[in-house]
From Swiss-Prot:
GO MF assignments: ATP binding; glutamate-cysteine ligase activity
Biological process, per Gene Ontology: modified amino acid biosynthetic process
Organism (species): Escherichia coli O139:H28 (strain E24377A / ETEC)
Pfam family, one: GCS2
Task performed by this protein: ATP-dependent carboxylate-amine ligase which exhibits weak glutamate--cysteine ligase activity.
Name this polypeptide is given: Putative glutamate--cysteine ligase 2
Record lineage: Bacteria, Pseudomonadati, Pseudomonadota, Gammaproteobacteria, Enterobacterales
Top EC category: ligase
Length: 372
């Protein structure tokens, strides 16, 4: 399928996607009943969309195009109410978190969807292992060239986005020692990590044409980059965050990305170059492994900075943009999080350290989501 032309969209508008866990009480393992839930709610959703993701234990909540995070929060809140009621009617529960702490990937059923079945044929068991749960944020752009500039700018802050949203310390019944283990699942995919370097939309079109020669890439949706342009929506899509435990934190993360995008495209503070990516995977690893306690390294100077310190600097820089976008409350909440040193991954570990079981942890996450 050829790459579509870049659809011009209103700059800085938002679209947010949350991949949620569908679980079976009282054992709180992943369910395989998302299709049943979707059928139950599809005619009751008035704004946004509830749809499938890769496997039958995943449920995706997606907003419509929103002008700001308050509109997005309203849509999510309405969807959440409908989904929770349907889940209760079917003796299921819903929660966030980037991974389910003890599910077995071998048990996961790939959705009966042509695209997902084709992906299963291409990638085999890797697709079942990709039963992990992330937050994706789309930001509108006026042109393809703006999208490429924005993608490179946002890529500088991938460690910050990962650290602030880290919520996947447990996987397959084990403490991984990572704050965010979810991104590691995609490391075996040939398109993992950052997008290959291009400097404008014309070069991106040539890149996509080259990738399509492999026959594994039929559309932009088949690419698993950390950040990717979405020409059919006219957006740049940030894909590195774990699904938070609360709707409020998901909205705050979207506000952060919207405000950062506004700052990048209005101030144009960077002259991007391929060398910017030399230490990308090392800095990304620091955020995944240590969260905000990680250290990032500047590829141009060799300077090493605590991620906590650099995140506070970012929040300060984008504060005026956040005000213009109506996202100041999000930036203030994230600032409090960084200063406190708390994140969801550590809260999960604290629960287990205090004697809680992994089953109890999932139950707690369901209570948190339902009570938010």
């Amino acid at each position: 399928m050829p790459l579509p032309d870049f659809h011009v969209s209103e700059p800085f508008t938002l679209g947010i996607e949350l991949e949620m866990q569908v679980v079976n009480p009282p054992g709180y393992d992943l369910s395989q009943d998302s299709s049943m839930l979707i059928d139950a709610v599809k005619n009751k959703i008035t704004a946004g969309e509830v749809k499938h993701d890769i496997t039958e234990s995943m449920l995706e909540l997606a907003t419509d195009v929103c002008r700001d995070i308050n509109q997005a929060a309203g849509q999510f809140s309405a969807m959440q109410k409908v989904v929770l009621q349907a889940a209760a009617d079917h003796h299921l529960e819903i929660c966030g978190g980037g991974t389910h702490p003890f599910q077995k990937w071998q048990r996961q059923e790939v959705c009966d969807n042509e695209r997902y079945q084709r992906t299963l044929e291409n990638f085999g068991y890797l697709i079942q292992q990709a039963t992990v749960f992330g937050q994706h944020v789309h930001v509108g752009c006026a042109s393809g060239d703006d999208a490429i500039y924005l993608l490179h700018g946002l890529s500088r802050f991938v460690p910050h986005f990962i650290a602030l949203s880290a919520a996947s310390p447990y996987m397959q019944g084990t403490d991984t020692r990572f704050a965010s283990s979810r991104p590691n699942i995609f490391s075996a995919f040939p398109d993992n990590g950052p997008m290959p370097w291009v400097s404008n939309w014309q070069q991106f079109e040539a890149l996509f044409r080259c990738l399509s020669y492999t026959t594994m890439i039929d559309s932009i949706k088949d690419l698993h980059w950390d950040i990717r342009p979405s020409p059919h929506f006219g957006t740049v899509e940030v894909r590195v965050m774990d699904t938070p435990l609360t709707l409020s934190h998901a909205v705050n993360m979207a506000g952060l990305i919207q405000a950062t995008a506004h700052w990048l495209l209005t101030e144009r503070p960077f002259k991007h170059q391929e060398k910017d990516y030399l230490l990308y995977k090392f800095n990304r690893f620091q955020a995944c492994r240590y969260g905000l306690e990680g250290v990032i390294t500047d590829p141009h100077t060799g300077d090493r900075r605590p991620l906590t310190e650099d995140t506070l600097r970012l929040l300060e820089k984008i504060a005026p943009s956040a005000h213009k976008m109506g996202a100041s409350s999000a930036i203030e909440a994230l600032h409090r999080q960084v200063v406190s040193g708390l994140n969801e991954a550590q809260l999960m570990r604290d629960f287990v350290a205090d004697g809680g079981s992994l089953i109890g942890l999932v139950k707690k996450h369901c209570e948190i989501w339902a009570g938010d």
